[in-house]
Amino acid sequence: MKGDSEMVEETIMLQSIDDVKSFATIANKKKYDVDIVSGKYLINAKSIMGIFSLDLTHPLNVVAYNDGDDNFLEEIDRFIYRPEENK
C-alpha cells in the first residue's frame, strides 16, 4: 500500500500500557499502512506486541501512508511529542 499514497510523519511518545493500546487501536482502524520507526527498527504500528518490543522511554517516529484525506494526525494528537511542553 505504500505506492501512490501520501506519507505523513510525526514523532510520538507512548508513556503507558493504555497509550500503547489506544495508539494501536487507532492504527488498526486505518486501511493503509502505519509504521513506527525507532533507531534501526521499523515495526507495524498495528501490532501491540511490536510496539512493546521498542524502547518506549524515547520518542518514536510514526509513518502513515494515507491517501491525504484522513484525520490520522488529529486522532493521534494526544500522543504527539512536543518537547517544549515537557520542560
Question: Locations of the language-model features?
Answer:
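Short, ordered loop/turn segments at secondary-structure junctions
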Residues: G39-K40, D67
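Short, Lys/Arg-enriched N-terminal segments with co-localized hydrophobic residues
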Residues: M1-E6
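Amphipathic alpha-helical interaction surfaces in cytosolic regulatory modules
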Residues: I17-D33, Y41-L56
